[in-house]
Amino acid sequence: MKVLVVGGGGREHAIVQKLRESREITALYCAPGNGGIARDAVCVPIKATDVEAIADWAAAEKMDYVVVTPDDPLCLGLVDLLAARGIPAFGPDRAAARIEGSKVFAKDLMRRYGIPTARYETFDDVEAALAYVRTAPCPVVVKADGLALGKGVLICETNAQAEEAVTEMMRHGKFGASGSRVVVEAFLEGPEVSVLCFTDGTAIRPMAASMDHKRALDGDRGLNTGGMGVIAPNPYYTPEVAARCMEEIFLPTLAAMRAEGCPFHGCLYFGLMITRDGPKVIEYNCRFGDPETQAVLPLMESDLLTVMRATTEGTLSQADVRFRDGASCCVVLASGGYPEKYETGKPIAGLAEAEKTARVYHAGTKALEDGTLVTSGGRVLGVTAVADDLPAAIRLAYEAADHIRFDGLHRREDIGARALRALG
């Protein structure tokens, strides 16, 4: 089979490497890919958001299957364009991708179908939003309705901070059209759990639960990022919690999407908070998480392509979906200044040493004509180690990461610390 993966980050590198294990694949491509992915697949220089060009290329090159993982092309309807050309794809169509593409759609869906989530209000008028947040009990969470690279969620400790967040989004256009509507919701307390699930719209198969570390600095301080590291499995996702999530959240969400006329197939990501009242949904994503994927897929024992095709063909209930015992830890190495302004073009050293004991997934890297690998993004690399237990996985990931050097390198030093405390 000829398979195309759409995207160019660390998540796509992890997916490409896992797909390489499949005996069915005869040719593997990635659009646009990056400097590391180029070692594992043929990179095609088309932006992931240029959905018409990708669909045309896939048809011209007779792709047998396309894996669409970034949120933008999913919300722009790439899966629909591929279907119109007779090409099966992994991922939801445009209508189903609204579960991530619009937080208003997602919150209203949960309210209509009784899926547990935080209390909230939605606003498309800036003055009404400002009037509400001036007196709302704090802390409060202000969310841009649309896609914002994982940075459109602001936790506001005071009413003044909430007013500033609303003003920046709705009046000053911080996130463009994505912030023209906002969701203002109650702040939930408890440990966070990320659960990626394969689904064909009816059957659902959760992957190993993980714990993301979204803040830029140690101790969960600093700005929200796309994610600075992940551990799996998540110790807060106990068998009891998992059973409640399946009954109260996972299956009802799939049923709700079917009832709305937009059944979801692909990877559905549940961002959960384990509160004193039980698990509640913080957010849905319509695709694999980044960097959760870089920690979860190394634990997967099944053939990834076979499982993906089962979600497309509606046969997931018969698919073999297995994850090994043990644990994994992914430490993200970022450019100094991320998630705000940062410099690129910094030469990267030490990869060969790191790769002796860990997987190194490339996110923001580029290969120059002379073969030199340089930084090209905010999150540059993800270093993942797998071991029999979590303490060993964390130690191995940091030991491998210590070998890697580039000017301005920033990382968190406490990935997995909260999970270790939970384990005692």
Functional labels for PLM-detected ranges:
Residues 365-370, 374-424:
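Generic C-terminus detector
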Residues 152-293:
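Internal nucleotide-binding/catalytic subdomain
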Residues 43-49, 121-125, 156:
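Short acidic-hydrophobic, aromatic-tinged amphipathic segments that line or gate anion-handling sites
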Residues 1-95:
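ATP-binding N-terminal substructure of ATP-dependent carboxylate-amine bond-forming enzymes
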Residues 246-268, 285-357, 368:
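Active-site "cap" helix and flanking loop/linker of ATP-utilizing ligase/carboxylase catalytic domains
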Residues 21, 36-38, 60, 90, ...:
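Solvent-exposed alpha-helices and their adjacent loops that cap or buttress functional pockets
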Residues 90-152:
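A conserved helix-loop-beta module that forms one wall/lid of the active-site cleft
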